[in-house]
Amino acid sequence: MAEMFYDDDADLSTITGKKVAVLGFGSQGHAHALSLRDSGVDVVVGLKEGSKSRAKAEEQGLTVLTPFEASKAADVIMVLVPDHLQRGLYAEAIEPNLTAGKALFFSHGFNIRFGYIKPPADVDVVMVAPKGPGHLVRREYVDGRGVPVIVAVEQDATGQAWALALAYAKAIGGLRAGGIKTTFTEETETDLFGEQAVLCGGASALVQTGFEVLTEAGYQPEVAYFECLHELKLIVDLMYEGGIAKQRWSVSDTAEWGDYVSGPRVIDASVKERMKDVLKDIQDGTFARNFIEDQDAGAPKFKELRAKAEQHPIEATGRELRKLMAWVKSDDSDYVEGSAAR
C-alpha cells in the first residue's frame, strides 16, 4: 500500500517563513498561488512581460514579477508551465538564480525524469501534484476541503525537502484529502502511460473507431455519435463515483452482459501487448525524445496530427448535435489547460 500523508503530518510554518515563486498562472498556477497566499505564504507570480495572465493575477491582489525576478527573490520556485517550455524557462530565468539551499518544485516529473532539466546538487528538487484540474483544486480549498496530491522528493540537499514538500501540499489543501508518496519516475511514467494508452490516446481511438464501424455499416452519423461518444460521459461519471463495479451495477443487465462478453474481444491480449510497447517507449525515453525534438523544430508533426484529427467526421457531427444541447457548455474562451502551440 502507498504511504499516505495528511494535515497532521505537515507543519505549515515550514513554508510560511519562505517566499514562494509560482511560475505560470494557468489552471494550476492560479490555484496554487491563491491558495498558498490564503494559507499565509509569501507568494509572487512569475510571468513574462506582455503575458495576458499578468492582469488576471494582479486583479487577484498578487504580486507579479518576471520569471527571472521571481526566481531571484524566492526560496521556493514552483514551475507550472507546459513541459516543453520548462527547459527554456529554466535556462533563462531559474538556473541563474538557483543558489544553494533553494528548492525547485514541479507538478509533473517529465523534465527531471528524462534529464532535460538538471538542477545542481545543492538544491532540493520536489514534486507536489494535485490529482485534479486547477479550478477544482481552488474550489475545494475555498470550501474547506482538498484534492488529493502526490508528493515526491528527487533531491534532498537541505535535509528539509520532505518537510517543505508536505508543508506546500498542506498549504494548497491537498493534505486535507490526502497525499500519496511517490517518485518522479513513477509519477512521470504512469502519468504518460495513462494519457497515451487509456485516457487520451486509448479513449479517443476507441471512440473514433467505434463511430467508423457504425457509419461504415450504414448507420446514421448522428446516432453513431450518441452511442459512441456522447454517452461515454454517463459511463465515466459512474466509474468516477464508484469504480467499474458501480458502472456495471448501474447499467442494464443487457449492457452488463455485453460488457463481460464483448469487452475482452475488443481489448484482448494483443492490445495488452501493444500497451506494454507504449509503456516501454515511455520508460526508455523514446516518447520524450520524439516529442521534444518535434517541439524544438516548431512542432510540425504535432500540428500535422492535430489538423488531421480535427478533420475526422465525428467532429463535424458533434458540432451540429451539440447545438441541440442547451446544457452543454461550448464556449472555451476561459480554458487555460490547453496547448501553448495553439
Curated annotation (Swiss-Prot):
Gene Ontology CC: one annotated term: cytosol
Active-site residues (renumbered): H108
Keyword field contains Oxidoreductase: yes
Protein residues bound to Mg(2+) 2: D191, E227, E231
GO biological process, one term: isoleucine biosynthetic process
GO molecular function: ketol-acid reductoisomerase activity; magnesium ion binding; NADP binding
Protein residues bound to Mg(2+) 1: D191, E195
Reactions listed under catalytic activity: (2R)-2,3-dihydroxy-3-methylbutanoate + NADP(+) = (2S)-2-acetolactate + NADPH + H(+); (2R,3R)-2,3-dihydroxy-3-methylpentanoate + NADP(+) = (S)-2-ethyl-2-hydroxy-3-oxobutanoate + NADPH + H(+)
Binding-site residues, NADP(+): F25, G26, S27, Q28, K48, S51, S53, D83, H84, L85, Q86, G134
Binding-site residues, substrate: S252
Keyword presence, rRNA-binding: no
KARI C-terminal knotted domain sequence ranges: 183-328
SUPFAM superfamilies: 6-phosphogluconate dehydrogenase C-terminal domain-like, NAD(P)-binding Rossmann-fold domains
Recorded metabolic or biological pathway in which this protein acts: Amino-acid biosynthesis; L-isoleucine biosynthesis; L-isoleucine from 2-oxobutanoate: step 2/4; Amino-acid biosynthesis; L-valine biosynthesis; L-valine from pyruvate: step 2/4
InterPro entries xref list: 6-PGluconate_DH-like_C_sf, KARI, KARI_C, KARI_N, KARI_prok, NAD(P)-bd_dom_sf
Comment on bound cofactor: Binds 2 magnesium ions per subunit.
Matches recorded under PROSITE patterns: KARI_C (PS51851), KARI_N (PS51850)
Domain of life: Bacteria
Keywords: Amino-acid biosynthesis, Branched-chain amino acid biosynthesis, Magnesium, Metal-binding, NADP, Oxidoreductase
Record-listed E.C. numbers: 1.1.1.86
Family to which the UniProt record says this protein belongs: Belongs to the ketol-acid reductoisomerase family.
Record's function text: Involved in the biosynthesis of branched-chain amino acids (BCAA). Catalyzes an alkyl-migration followed by a ketol-acid reduction of (S)-2-acetolactate (S2AL) to yield (R)-2,3-dihydroxy-isovalerate. In the isomerase reaction, S2AL is rearranged via a Mg-dependent methyl migration to produce 3-hydroxy-3-methyl-2-ketobutyrate (HMKB). In the reductase reaction, this 2-ketoacid undergoes a metal-dependent reduction by NADPH to yield (R)-2,3-dihydroxy-isovalerate.
HAMAP family per the UniProt record, alphabetical: IlvC
Protein name in UniProt: Ketol-acid reductoisomerase (NADP(+))
